């Protein structure tokens, strides 16, 4: 029985980690399809970071007026969800288009990873319902497993915060690009590339915070669903076992 407790607790911890990974991947992938990131939020961030006082100044800094940028933003956001999008959009040059295709491929992989993580977490919830069905202290075992999973996530979060404080967002952001992309297309020139003028570092910092918040919300929703799955399936299994014991 003690071995079954250990297995059930370990599976509960793994379920928490999978749910969190799925939530983070899903939140980042979803944010990439938000047109406001490339449109209104872009212009607001450029205005604030450059200390501009009018939309005309923002237009001059970016090289696109609000209407043209909104149209471009809609096309970029739509393309992030389509494997066949080539991003041959005005006024983007060939390097910018190629980089957007790279980003799109990454976002699609993150979306797929999110679905896989959620599917595995749901499957584990069913397995946990089965392995924990005969445990006398099932709830305590599950809580300990969940606490272990949350503890692991907290440790990773604290490590990331420490890295951000020690290295800075810019260095970590550049390192992530070097890790995720096999080319240097992400290195852009403000003189020739509109994307870098549209999307300064501050925009990515805010987007990262938004993605983290979105991941927390999605994690909470998925967690509630997983609890419901385990409770429903576990209840059915325990009732079946009780009937067998009576027979």
Regions found by a protein language model. Name each.
Residues 59-81:
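Short, non-transmembrane cytosolic segments of multipass membrane proteins
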Residues 166-194:
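Juxtamembrane non-transmembrane "cap" segments at the membrane-aqueous interface
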Residues 73-117, 201-216:
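Individual transmembrane alpha-helix segments
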Residues 24-67:
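Aromatic-rich transmembrane-lumenal/periplasmic boundary elements in polytopic membrane proteins
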Residues 53-64, 87-95, 152-169:
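Hydrophobic alpha-helical transmembrane segments
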Residues 2-13, 118-169, 223-247:
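Juxtamembrane interface at the cytosolic side of transmembrane helices
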Residues 184-241:
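Terminal transmembrane helical module of multi-pass membrane proteins
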Residues 1-37:
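Hydrophobic secretory-pathway targeting helix
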């Amino acid at each position: 029985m003690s071995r079954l407790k250990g297995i059930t607790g370990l599976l509960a911890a793994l379920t928490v980690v999978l749910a969190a990974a799925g939530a983070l991947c899903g939140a980042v992938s979803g944010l990439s399809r938000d047109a406001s990131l490339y449109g209104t939020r872009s212009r607001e961030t450029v205005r604030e970071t450059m200390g501009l006082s009018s939309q005309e100044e923002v237009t001059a800094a970016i090289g696109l007026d609000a209407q043209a940028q909104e149209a471009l933003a809609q096309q970029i956001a739509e393309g992030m969800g389509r494997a066949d999008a080539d991003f041959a959009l005005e006024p983007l040059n060939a390097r910018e288009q190629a980089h957007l295709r790279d980003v799109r491929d990454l976002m699609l992989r993150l979306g797929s990873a999110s679905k896989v993580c959620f599917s595995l977490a749901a499957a584990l919830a069913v397995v946990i319902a089965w392995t924990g069905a005969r445990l006398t202290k099932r709830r305590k075992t599950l809580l300990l497993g969940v606490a272990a999973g949350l503890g692991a996530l907290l440790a990773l979060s604290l490590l990331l915060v420490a890295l951000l404080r020690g290295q800075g967002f810019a260095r970590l952001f550049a390192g992530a690009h070097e890790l995720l992309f096999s080319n240097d297309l992400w290195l852009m020139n403000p003189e020739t590339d509109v994307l870098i003028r549209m999307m300064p570092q501050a925009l990515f910092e805010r987007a990262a915070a938004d993605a983290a918040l979105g991941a927390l919300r999605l994690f909470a929703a998925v967690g509630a669903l997983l609890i419901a799955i385990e409770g429903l399936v576990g209840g059915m299994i325990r009732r079946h076992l009780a009937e067998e014991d009576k027979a």
